[in-house]
């Protein structure tokens, strides 16, 4: 799935509350 441009990587995008926010990955792919 596409992710917000302010996210460096797809795994940084995390669903939170009403939308998607950027967070660090808790794991490596």
From Swiss-Prot:
The keyword Secreted applies. InterPro entries: Scorpion_toxin-like_sf. Keywords: Disulfide bond, Secreted. Signal peptide: none annotated. Contains 3 disulfide bonds. It is found in: Secreted. Disulfide bonds: none annotated. It comes from the Eukaryota. Expressed by the venom gland. GO terms for cellular component: extracellular region. Negative results: does not show any effect on Na(+), Ca(2+) currents, nor on voltage-gated and calcium-activated potassium channels. This is Neurotoxin BmK A3-6. The lineage of its organism: Eukaryota, Metazoa, Ecdysozoa, Arthropoda, Chelicerata.
């Amino acid at each position: 799935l596409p992710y917000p441009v302010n996210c460096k990587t797809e795994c940084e995008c995390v669903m939170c509350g009403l939308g998607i926010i950027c967070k660090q990955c808790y794991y490596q792919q």
